[in-house]
Amino acid sequence: MSFFENTRKPVGLGGKIMVAMMNFGHSAMAAWGLRFLQPAPDAMVLDCGCGGGANIKTLLKLCPKGKVQGIDYSAVSVEKARKVNADAIAAGRCTVQQASVAELPFEAEQFEVVTAFETVYFWPELAQNFREVYRVLKPGGVFFICNEANGETAKDDKWTQIINGMTIYTDTALKAYLEQAGFCKIQSHKNKKGWLCVTARK
């Protein structure tokens, strides 16, 4: 497995290095995208594909009276995310568990916000996975997607060739999948760097 395969499912030493790099490398994109998300201070939030947990930490600050749960199907990512958010976990404001978006381990209508940073590229069955997100969102809840690639630049093809199982979606494609899952009020935002943020409501 190549080092870049660890972007999909970090494992072993290479995975630990990749997770640490992701926590740092995606911070500017996450900060940009979060301008389009305004969660309530007491919101219940789920971060899907939480990676090394940096975005969980940011979401906990955005929701000082709320709780944030994270899932990732990589054990390496879960371990790192738990370390990064150890204080919040000890305070009962955060949990991180190993799970897949294909079958979210939560009851229906549990979250006001579900986030997905740099992860939908690797979701196995986007239509079904979006329906799972829809299921766990409360009515009126927001699904927030933030990607560093928008499927419209030449460099995007390079990454899909290097990383097996990666699919880069345009905002138009994501909107179609979201509508198919039942979402409405879909909005997309892009910048000159090719970053993409999409929000949708249940």
What are these regions (language model features)?
Residues 42, 137-142:
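Short glycine-dipeptide loop
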Residues 24-43, 58:
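Conserved alpha-helix/loop element of class I SAM-dependent methyltransferases that forms part
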Residues 10-23, 27, 142-199:
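C-terminal alpha-helical "lid/dimerization" subdomain adjacent to the S-adenosyl-L-methionine
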Residues 112-126:
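A short SAM/SAH-binding and catalytic strip from SAM-dependent methyltransferases
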Residues 102-113:
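A short acidic, Gly/Pro-enriched loop at the edge of an enzyme's catalytic core
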Residues 127-139:
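A short glycine-rich, Lys/Arg-flanked "PGG" loop and its adjoining helix->strand segment in the class I
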Residues 44-103:
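Class I SAM-dependent methyltransferase SAM/SAH-binding core
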Residues 37-39, 62-63, 137:
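A generic alpha-to-beta junction signature in SAM-dependent methyltransferases
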